[in-house]
Amino acid sequence: IINDNVRIIINDGNFEIGDWNIIHNDTLLISKDYLKIKNNVWIGQNSVLDGTGGLTIKNGVRIGMQSQIWSHAKTGEEIEGCILNVAQPTTIEDEVWIQGNCLIGSGISIGYRSIGLLGSVLHQNINSNKVFKGNPAKEVNGLKMYRKVSEKRKMRLMMDWSTEFKSIHYQDLEIINNDNQIKLKLNSDEIIIAIDKPSKIIKNFTYFIISNKQFIKTNSFLERTFYKFLYSNKARFNYN
């Protein structure tokens, strides 16, 4: 979904965007070298994503409103001897959450599942599973936002959500549950939820794989409506 007044400026660069992304109002996207946005990305309004030096936004990233992510810095006049002309690739890894009003400098890498608290100004790389805040931003020791969830527990959650989805949307949805798989069936559409990818893939079935968060899509009606139900904060899966 690309909302009102979003501007995408492509200046000889590559622009790539995946599935199930939301870009809110008045956001500016620039691709001079490259700008790559993968799947399940949410970008708040009035944000800036600068791909002048190359910018990669990976799966499941959340970017709060009025945030800016840069990949270049340039000012002053060459004729006067200014040497500030930097373009470096910036990378935001999977499932990073950048809260509102954050600034990310050029050439920065933010590791998997790290979180930038409100108003952070980041000038250095951040490792995976870290929380950072402040200006200049620094890591906050001892603060964790995730807990370990077993694959068995994940399957129970998916079963609970399947049942909830049926009660809200489709009373005639058929749900079949066994130890390793959950099957959803509505008319000719079928979804398989499994811990691991089955050895045999049935054509025209949608598969949600728990172990690697991947899904094999068919773009069926049931797939789209079920994934829309999950997508916000229940579970997200990535299509390759």
What spans do the regions from the language model cover?
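Hydrophobic/aromatic ligand-binding patch that stacks against planar heteroaromatic rings
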Residues: 60, 113, 131
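Short, solvent-exposed secondary-structure boundary motifs
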Residues: 58, 111-112, 123, 174-176
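Terminal amphipathic alpha-helical/low-complexity segments used for targeting or macromolecular assembly
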Residues: 135-240
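C-terminal/domain-terminus segments
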Residues: 110-124, 203
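Residues that flank catalytic or metal-binding motifs in active/ligand-binding sites
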Residues: 65, 118, 128
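Contiguous mid-protein beta-loop-alpha structural module that forms a pocket-lining wall or clamp
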Residues: 122-129, 136-140
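Flexible, glycine/small-residue-enriched loop-and-beta-strand segment within the central core
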Residues: 1-109, 135-136, 141-145
